[in-house]
Amino acid sequence: MKNWACMIHSVKFIGILDTNVIYPIEIRDILFWFAHYDLFTPKWSKHIFEEWERVMIRKGITQVEAKKRSNIANQAFPDAFVENYENLIPNIELPDKDDKHVLAAAIKTNANVIVTNNLKDFPQDYLAKFSISAKSADDFIADIIDLNNEKAIMAFRELVMNRRNPNLDEYQVLDNLRKNGLTNSANYLHSLL
């Protein structure tokens, strides 16, 4: 397994973002702001974004708006889009065949970690064959905070300042993070404020 703990605070540290950490917005926002502050390099694929768009549509967002949001993410992180991974999918063995594309994209881009809240479908022993691990969004974000408190707080504060509709203060944003399963991360950030 790669010694990713020493690399995580670097843009060289690559994390594939599974759909379930791109939606809901509270998790996506903090991940995107941490990436903006070069705390890690985000990656995703066409399959992941198509799934994200379907989730948004199921949640009542129009197809046009869903496509607009995915395009904005691709424009904000133009190097995040992983291509030419499809040929790896048939050879991957995971408990849920619908998750094979996530690991294929991770392998293709030499990712260090798959950030997912669906850990049961990404067995660590199997991922280790590819020098990849899987972490929940909460564990991944808490690790980033731990390795670079100063930049993480700067990113968090900018997230709060840019938050619209509704405008929320730091503590309200932290409460939203907790409600979305980022309890450890929110508590860690809270302790640094």
Q: What do these predicted ranges mean?
A:
Residues 50, 54-77, 147-155, 162-163:
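Extended, non-globular alpha-helical segments
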Residues 78-113, 147-149, 183-193:
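Active-site neighborhoods of divalent-metal-dependent phosphate/nucleic-acid chemistry enzymes
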Residues 1-29:
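Metal-dependent nucleic-acid phosphoesterase active-site entry motif
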Residues 21-22, 90-98, 120-123:
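Acidic, metal-coordinating catalytic cores used for nucleic-acid/nucleotide bond scission
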Residues 120-193:
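Acidic, PIN/NYN-like endoribonuclease modules and their adjacent C-terminal/linker elements
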Residues 99-133:
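Acidic, metal-binding active-site segment of PIN/NYN-like and related structure-specific nucleases
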Residues 41, 81, 131-133:
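Conserved beta-strand segments of alpha/beta enzyme cores
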Residues 25-59:
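PIN/NYN-family metal-dependent endoribonuclease catalytic core
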